[in-house]
């Protein structure tokens, strides 16, 4: 194996960083040895409480029981907005950068307080109360953050659906959460194109008779259909409401939000997060992992429709009184220099994006980068998937000009906040490694039988204890929560990822070990794509796997078996691609479709996905034993016809 490069902590960063390595070690050891004392101190330091909790932490992962700060009361919107008014009411809270370079807006903490209060009162006026679910289907506009915080203010549980999802996917999520209110927009704008969010919502609601109210944000002024009894203009409803809305006193363990994520089987799961533990996790990681210093501009390029946007555009930064940037556009519009132009325009200090964006921009060459100064940058970050060392090096040398540490952060929708990442002032960096665990996180590598592996080794990544921002359940299905995450290795949380630990104890994430593919940093369950493909009346069976993709990390490779008598064609391929987009969204579009007369199955009828993955990845010399297949000749045909030669 080639020698791993090590990049030491720059002296300029070390000088002012919140923590050095000794301080990290001391805090980490305490968080593992004395969780009660440690979490109690942090909860007091980072959050404001209405009343104190009884028990700091209680968990029994073998039973699926997780509780932190139970009995304590607080409010997330109060912590993200109200408590900053006295000291920084006139400071910018959110910088909004629109799709077009000449559109932007600065929203102060005082503005934010009023906007959140008005919407909170407008929701209450329409019958929304503590515990009710509100679905948010918005583009990257400030109203998305306002809607999240307004829900949190009154104790309603928000469920955000990414604006790129189809009407069918939106409908399923509204139905599963049993939401009675939807907040959407006339249209979204992205990369110079408009997205028909209101039309998608109308279509989705044909199957959701329970939805009583739809708030519509006016983003483009485009023509939309209107349902008089149900639809209300967001700006009109807010204008009629008072800006002052008393924050609901929430128990630490009350749900804050549900966010749907792809699983390896069946329909998406509604990951449910708590109030206090989640907010504490996002605030602490935002401060320490990004080494956030007061007054800096922090930019996470994610969409609020994903957990990264929840935790690191809205909740973490605002809990810390930060200036957070929200970007409506895409990295390549109007040209491939847009990210760096925005960095210069708003003097961004901390920049957090996905490896897939870095690889795409790297492919466009350095000219767009060189036209900008980027001198304000101090810390760079990556999220969503492991970053390959080549992309890491380009990010470090070309974007950061050798002066900005890169925090390669590993976490999941389910974990709520970052679990494994370097601290910029404390740890030497190895390109491609997620480095070391955050406070209170105890990673282990286990073999398939659950034996804990010591030292430098490869294995399945599990976490051996609960942490505050950990998901509490799958909405409406605690049994599925337990079976998915806690049953495989009793007493441990199973991440679904494989990892390697090196001789320095650094962790390297090697990718999913289940049937989930990571496309451009977003999870896509193979079962979801397969279900969409078999809806076509000419398709008898489909199997979907991931394969290495230069830009996206993983691409979607679909093997499709047709009904007897049906012929493969390019037209049929196009129809199948359209079907996936219609059922799920553009993110689920197969990159490669291979028509296969048969799939490799065991004698009991189970599809051998391992073989399909190897064929899709052209790893033909490591297919393993095919003798257990019902018909081993199927594999020869797959290899001969493979579309990825």
Swiss-Prot record:
It catalyses: acetate + ATP + CoA = acetyl-CoA + AMP + diphosphate. CoA binds at residues 190-193, 308, 520. Mg(2+) binds at residues 534, 536, 539. InterPro entries: Ac_CoA_lig (IPR011904), ACAS_N (IPR032387), AMP-bd_C (IPR025110), AMP-bd_C_sf (IPR045851), AMP-binding_CS (IPR020845), AMP-dep_synth/lig_dom (IPR000873), ANL_N_sf (IPR042099). Coiled coil: none annotated. ATP binds at residues 384-386, 408-413, 497, 512, 523. PROSITE patterns: AMP_BINDING. GO terms for cellular component: cytosol. The modification N6-acetyllysine is found at residue 606. Gene3D superfamilies: 3.30.300.30, N-terminal domain of ligase-like (3.40.50.12780). GO terms for biological process: acetyl-CoA biosynthetic process from acetate. GO terms for molecular function: acetate-CoA ligase activity; AMP binding; ATP binding; metal ion binding. Its EC number is 6.2.1.1. It is an enzyme of class 6 (ligase). Its cofactor is Mg(2+). Keywords: Acetylation, ATP-binding, Ligase, Magnesium, Metal-binding, Nucleotide-binding. Acetylated. Deacetylation by the SIR2-homolog deacetylase activates the enzyme. Catalyzes the conversion of acetate into acetyl-CoA (AcCoA), an essential intermediate at the junction of anabolic and catabolic pathways. AcsA undergoes a two-step reaction. In the first half reaction, AcsA combines acetate with ATP to form acetyl-adenylate (AcAMP) intermediate. In the second half reaction, it can then transfer the acetyl group from AcAMP to the sulfhydryl group of CoA, forming the product AcCoA. PANTHER family: ACETYL-COENZYME A SYNTHETASE, ACETYL-COENZYME A SYNTHETASE 1. Belongs to the ATP-dependent AMP-binding enzyme family. This is Acetyl-coenzyme A synthetase. It comes from Halorhodospira halophila (strain DSM 244 / SL1). The gene is acsA.
